[in-house]
């Protein structure tokens, strides 16, 4: 599901809300999640899951085009861990 599809789905389930308001809310939610992670904070949505940052050590990579070794620096990457309720609902599929 893309962001546009999410907005359309939410708008169709809430016909009293203008689609522009739904779009604004979705964009604000994503912006808030991003800003919180940028500050290094963890986000927990009970029953759904948690977002956090994981540290990746510097490592030696390889340029696939030339085969040349390249040093990749350390970095933080976003990580999502599904909550118990989400895992149980998805497991029913």
Curated annotation (Swiss-Prot):
Belongs to the bacterial histone-like protein family. PROSITE patterns: HISTONE_LIKE. Keywords: DNA recombination, DNA-binding, Transcription, Transcription regulation, Translation regulation. GO terms for biological process: DNA recombination; regulation of DNA-templated transcription; regulation of translation. This is Integration host factor subunit beta. Heterodimer of an alpha and a beta chain. The keyword Transcription applies. It comes from Mannheimia haemolytica (Pasteurella haemolytica). GO terms for cellular component: chromosome; cytosol. InterPro entries: Hist_DNA-bd (IPR000119), Histone-like_DNA-bd_CS (IPR020816), IHF-like_DNA-bd_dom_sf (IPR010992), IHF_beta (IPR005685). This protein is one of the two subunits of integration host factor, a specific DNA-binding protein that functions in genetic recombination as well as in transcriptional and translational control. CDD domains: IHF_B. The lineage of its organism: Bacteria, Pseudomonadati, Pseudomonadota, Gammaproteobacteria, Pasteurellales. Transmembrane segments: none annotated. It comes from the Bacteria.
């Amino acid at each position: 599901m893309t962001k546009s599809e999410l907005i359309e789905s939410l708008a169709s389930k809430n016909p009293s809300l203008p689609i522009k308001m739904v779009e604004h809310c979705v964009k604000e939610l994503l912006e808030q999640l991003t800003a919180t992670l940028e500050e290094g904070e963890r986000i927990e949505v009970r029953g759904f899951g948690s977002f956090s940052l994981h540290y990746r050590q510097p490592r030696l990579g390889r340029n696939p085009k030339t085969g040349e070794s390249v040093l990749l620096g350390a970095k933080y990457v976003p990580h999502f861990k599904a909550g118990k309720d989400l895992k149980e609902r998805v497991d029913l599929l």
